[in-house]
Each structure stands twice: as structure tokens, then as C-alpha cells.
């Protein structure tokens, strides 16, 4: 069910990411460095456990989870959040909650690309990845 996401993906375009990070509460210096990074995303599945790694010159992160089960996550900008990821109509829906706030990250396949849509309040960022 998540096989379409498995593989190594490289960032090829990013829209509105600085505004999204600002809405999340990421500081200026971190936004500038993170905004210039071109991360690779590596997605793998082992039984029920899905792993998403992000590797860049800015920071490397890794989360492993089971669909529908809440887990603790430390984000690339060091927020400590409670995350839940579900599969809804072929879209991986990742909800992060912290300090009474929440953001949603949707990962979906479109043609041969992986499209990541990050939403915080009224701000949306779209980041497009291609197979590496």
C-alpha cells in the first residue's frame, strides 16, 4: 500500500517554504539555511514499519512509524511534536501537534514525482521530489 512511496527522492522544486517555516515558528537564521538545502528523502517499508529519512547539508532526520499510531518526533528545527501518519486515498497524511498548534504534511505521488504539501493555518508550501 505504501510501495509507491518507497525509494530515494531528491528535491527539485520548492514553493513558499520560507513562509510556511515562518508560520510554524522557525527562526530567521534556521529558515535561511533550511531554505537553501536540497534534501534527499529516503522512504522504506519493513513489515508494518515505515521509515522516512531526510538527508541534507542542513540536517539529517529519520522517523519510523506504524500507520495510525502516534509517536514522538523531533523535527529538523528541533520542535518536539506528537505525530500521527495515516494513509488516506493514497496520500500519506502526517499531522504534527505541539504547544496547542498543529501542521499537516501530505505526501502524494503525482506521475513520476513525489509531491509534499505542508500546511500551517492558511499557509501552504509545495515541494516536489523526483527519483534520485
Swiss-Prot record:
Keywords: Acetylation, Cytoplasm, Lipid-binding, Nucleus, Phosphoprotein, Transport. Lipid transport protein in adipocytes. Binds both long chain fatty acids and retinoic acid. Delivers long-chain fatty acids and retinoic acid to their cognate receptors in the nucleus. One of its GO terms (biological process) is positive regulation of cold-induced thermogenesis. It is found in: Cytoplasm; Nucleus. The modification Phosphoserine is found at residue 13. This is Fatty acid-binding protein, adipocyte. A fatty acid binds at residues 127-129.
Amino acid at each position: 500500500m505504501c510501495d509507491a512511496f518507497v525509494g530515494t527522492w531528491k528535491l527539485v522544486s520548492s514553493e513558499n517554504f520560507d513562509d510556511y517555516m515562518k508560520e510554524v515558528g522557525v527562526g530567521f537564521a534556521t529558515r535561511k539555511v533550511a531554505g537553501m538545502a536540497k534534501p534527499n528523502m529516503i522512504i522504506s517499508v519493513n513489515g508494518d514499519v515505515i521509515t522516512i529519512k531526510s538527508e541534507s547539508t542542513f540536517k539529517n532526520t529519520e522517523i519510523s512509524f506504524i500507520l495510525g499510531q502516534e509517536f514522538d518526533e523531533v523535527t529538523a528545527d528541533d520542535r518536539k511534536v506528537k505525530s500521527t501518519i495515516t494513509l488516506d486515498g493514497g496520500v500519506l497524511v502526517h499531522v504534527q501537534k505541539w504547544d496547542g498548534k498543529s501542521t499537516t504534511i501530505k505526501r502524494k505521488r503525482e506521475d513520476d514525482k513525489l509531491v509534499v504539501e505542508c500546511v500551517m493555518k492558511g499557509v501552504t508550501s509545495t515541494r516536489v521530489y523526483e527519483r534520485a
